[in-house]
Design a protein with these regions (language model features):
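Short hydrophobic/aromatic-enriched beta-strand-loop microsegments
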Residues: 41-45, 90-96, 150-155, 175-178, ...
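Catalytic binding pocket for nucleotide-activated donors in carbohydrate/polymer assembly enzymes
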Residues: 69, 202, 207-289, 304
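Active-site and donor-binding regions of nucleotide-sugar-utilizing enzymes
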Residues: 1-107, 126, 130-132, 143-145, ...
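Short acidic alpha-helix that forms the nucleotide-activated donor recognition element
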Residues: 8-13, 184-191, 200-210, 231
Length: 309
């Protein structure tokens, strides 16, 4: 928690020489105590938007917090242009988003998942970090689209508690949970819809996808990580709420990602990707190229911190 006592206790225990905060982390008491003790602090992979409190007439306290950073490293020129007028002595530089390097590392060290090969023949559609609104739409489309009869669905819900898995399962006919299937796979029919009821598999599952769908686009907070799928050269689909995510907008503009608005547009998009192999490959290739083009943020970030610490 961000409190004077918590900050003091943490400083005494860790005794940091430098502190790096990530993206949206603004911990006032930690920043203040670091400034008093002349400990360099950096905000990395930061993103700023006009609707944030820093740019409101009542955001003076939050604007003053920005002055406590030794340096702020932003993802893009839009963030830099927004924040530059608010800074005095704080160093400011565009370094990009370190998540691009992270997903490239995941792809380079990918691990095989044995049970995927046991699925029925056909293309696999992986849906990652999905919510109830996603399940309603995906469930409707999977039951209607003729082209999807030859596909396997791997559904990876954002929440894997019993109630959430039960709710997810209710949207799909004859869906099977992974834990259930693995214990009875010798006697149970191979699933068309497999619901992953455990954590830690999603980033590795995308390598097996013909198409990836990213959840969260129908929630207030927006979509989850599109880069984990894009790095494997997969066409990536998501819902309408992506305006807070520069990487998603960039992926769309690079023709590696497709935004859908409802069940009808998802149906049409899936049919196009499944029927038109040239289009599907071009979309996947564009997704990978987009990720590769944005590599290097980690090195830039480390160099900036080293030079300004």
């Amino acid at each position: 928690f961000d409190s004077p006592s918590a900050a003091t206790q943490w400083m005494e225990m860790v005794q940091p020489k430098c502190i790096v905060f990530i993206k949206y982390e603004f911990w006032y008491y930690y920043l203040k105590l670091a400034a008093v003790n002349k400990i360099p602090t950096f905000l990395a992979s930061a993103v700023f938007r006009p609707d944030q409190i820093f740019f409101k007439f009542y955001g003076g306290f939050y604007r003053s917090m920005l002055q406590l950073f030794t340096g702020i490293l932003v993802q893009d020129i839009h963030s830099k242009n927004l924040i530059a007028p608010l800074l005095k002595d704080t160093h400011l530089q565009i370094t990009g988003d370190t998540r691009f390097d992270r997903v490239l590392d995941i792809a380079a060290t990918k691990k095989s998942i044995d049970w995927v090969s046991k699925l029925a023949e056909g293309k696999i559609i992986v849906t990652g970090s999905t919510w109830e609104d996603d399940h309603q739409i995906i469930g409707s489309v999977s039951a209607q689209c003729d082209q999807l009869e030859q596909c396997n669905w791997i559904i990876v819900p954002h929440h894997v508690d019993a109630a959430s898995i039960k709710a997810c399962r209710s949207h799909f006919t004859n869906a099977i949970c992974l834990s259930e299937w693995l214990t009875q796979s010798n006697t149970m029919e191979k699933p068309v819809v497999l619901i992953i009821d455990q954590i830690g598999l999603l980033s590795q599952l995308y390598q097996y996808a013909a198409i990836a769908y990213i959840g969260g686009g129908f929630t207030k907070d927006g979509i989850h990580n599109v880069l984990e799928a894009a790095v494997f050269g997969k066409p990536v689909i998501w819902g309408p709420n992506d305006l807070k995510y520069p990487e998603a907008i960039g992926l769309r503009n690079a023709y590696g990602g497709i935004q859908i608005m409802d069940a009808s547009s998802l149906n049409k998009t899936l049919e196009k990707l499944l029927n038109e192999t040239t289009f599907s490959k071009a979309t996947g290739d564009a997704a990978l190229k987009f990720v590769q083009a944005h590599a290097g943020a980690t090195q830039k970030t480390m160099e900036f911190i080293y030079e300004n610490r």
